[in-house]
Amino acid sequence: MRKLFILCAFLLQLLSPVYPQQATTATIEPNLKYGKPSKEELSLTSYAPDTTATAIYLFHQGQSDFIYHDGFQLTTEHWVRIKILKPQGVSYADVSVPYYSPTDKDEGQERASEIEGCSYNMENGKCIKTPMKRESISFERFNNLYKILKFSLPAVKEGTIIEYHYKLYSDYFSHIDNWMMQEELPMLYNQYKNHHPSCICLQHRTPGKGLHTSEAKRLLHSCHRT
């Protein structure tokens, strides 16, 4: 009886279906070349780990730098690539970015600049790129403290890849916004970099489990005075 059970288990293992396409979509290699989506990304039709996803972040990269011009300023750039998987995901082509801009100019300001975006669609076997026009970008006053950068990517439908980039300049160099490693959409790749001079002290905190950092310990950079 034991031999029969082992034989049956072995046969069931051999007859179990294999899903190579599912494994492929679940393990897409990160393609971080902004402006150059891969054929694999363009041909992607679903996301195996979450088949209900209407869209997915292929990547979201950020980089903060400190610049000096009559005082320090903090700049933070964003590069984003999203794949639209279902018609309901088209709404992610409408982007809103709030930023601090009080009506009292003496309080310091943030501003958004270097805004660009485009969409990619496969048509007759060719990748068609459609850049975002200037008219699609607007700035709206939300309240006496915040403005909102708004823009809409063109020619978006099921199967489209959208990309966009923007840069925030802030007078509040001592305050770095939290970086979200996961959003409401599945995130395939997320990276944040911070470059700062040695005269500025930063403490790095990574709450949560399973985050990969270049150093296991919490870092506290020392200040060097001249």
Predicted regions and their residues:
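Bacterial Sec-dependent N-terminal signal peptides
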Residues: 1-26
